[in-house]
């Protein structure tokens, strides 16, 4: 299954989520950010590639819908409601990601 994680800058939350799946046998994972200065800025190709898209906040889903409505048709978009207060790799962020993703990704 192909998963895409989205936050604002693709430096802390979405990148941490992507790293959780390094070498996972059942998931291919990428991450991107919605803002112009993002490490990797989300593009139509990311959305076309992904089967399921996880956004950290509602504003990320809103931005994707504004910019990529056609590419999102038929896609599952899940809002995780994880605030922008955790640095990359933070243990609390990892625990929160695991907790929120467990309902959506049974093989995590």
Give a label for each model feature:
Residues 1-108:
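Short polar/charged helix/loop
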